[in-house]
Regions:
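Conserved alpha/beta cores of soluble small-molecule-handling proteins
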Residues: 1-154
């Protein structure tokens, strides 16, 4: 297995919708759109001592994805950066860390597919875990390219 469990992750704090919570308490509602119908956008970020790789590109993609899905109450890039910094600082992380940054449409007032049921705004989750790099790029990586090509939409 390329990814291994790190026992240090047992006691991490996770940012869920403005609160830093212990791993065992970090949960979203069963009425959250990510649970109801998989409605969320996410980015995977890698932390090195020099900083987060392609930080602004990740945040732009997250924002653009949320806008494309017509999310309401999207946190600003500065608000997201603040949540990431708070999470990393609270866990003493500055290297060998992977962040799963997730933005959901938020909690619904009742179950259903209609996005108008989302009345509380987006839910931001910052899950930072101690993880070594998965790929050793000095050896190259194996890639498979599909023979199927999609044309550019008109």
């Amino acid at each position: 297995m390329l990814q291994e469990y790190n026992p240090k992750n047992e006691n991490i704090l996770i940012h869920v919708n403005g609160k830093l919570l212990p791993r065992k308490d970090a949960k979203v509602s069963v009425f959250d759109s990510i649970v109801q119908n998989g409605d969320g956008v996410w980015e995977g970020l890698r932390v090195y001592p020099e900083g987060i790789v392609s930080y602004d590109k990740h945040l732009t993609r997250l924002h653009e994805g949320a806008k494309a899905l017509a999310y309401e109450g999207i946190p600003s890039k500065n608000e997201i950066k603040k949540a990431i910094k708070e999470t990393l600082d609270a866990n003493g992380m500055n290297t060998d860390t992977h962040i799963r940054l997730t933005l959901t449409r938020g909690e619904k007032v009742t179950s259903g597919m209609d996005s108008r049921l989302n009345q509380s705004g987006c839910c931001l989750i910052v899950l930072a875990e101690w993880k070594k790099k998965v790929y050793d790029f000095s050896k190259g990586i194996r890639a498979i390219s599909s023979s199927i090509r999609r044309s550019i939409p008109a």
